[in-house]
Amino acid sequence: MSEETLAYIESVIAERRKASPEDSYVSSLFHRGTAHIAQKVGEEAVETVIAALAQDKKSLESEAADLIFHLAVLLADRGSSFENVFSELRRREGVSGHAEKAARPKS
């Protein structure tokens, strides 16, 4: 999936966000709030893991698409985007995963 594809998905989400919740699934997600959207991301993540463990490539791809879509909705809901995620990934490029994790603030 290219950055252009994700940008297109984000533009569709932004447009559908303006629609009536009765007419648009995307709008209904925003209408129900961040907690509901986050729950949907969690559900799709679990379904993706289950499909992967079942070694069902087609289901894995389908569930991964659902996960990416719902993640895009969550990012939009929180005022973020995949571009910001890509910037963070670029920032981490060349940094050891262990070193990056160790440098994070302790919570």
From Swiss-Prot:
Gene Ontology CC entries for this record: cytoplasm
Gene3D superfamilies in the cross-refs: MazG-like
Top-level EC class: hydrolase
One of the record's GO molecular function terms: ATP binding
One GO term of the biological process aspect: L-histidine biosynthetic process
One Pfam family of this chain: PRA-PH
Protein family membership: Belongs to the PRA-PH family.
Keyword check for ATP-binding: yes
Predominant subcellular localization, coarse grouping: cytoplasm
Localization (cell): Cytoplasm
Alphabetized CDD domains for the sequence: NTP-PPase_HisIE_like
Record's catalysed reaction(s): 1-(5-phospho-beta-D-ribosyl)-ATP + H2O = 1-(5-phospho-beta-D-ribosyl)-5'-AMP + diphosphate + H(+)
E.C. number(s) listed in UniProt: 3.6.1.31
Name this protein carries in UniProt: Phosphoribosyl-ATP pyrophosphatase
UniProt pathway: Amino-acid biosynthesis; L-histidine biosynthesis; L-histidine from 5-phospho-alpha-D-ribose 1-diphosphate: step 2/9
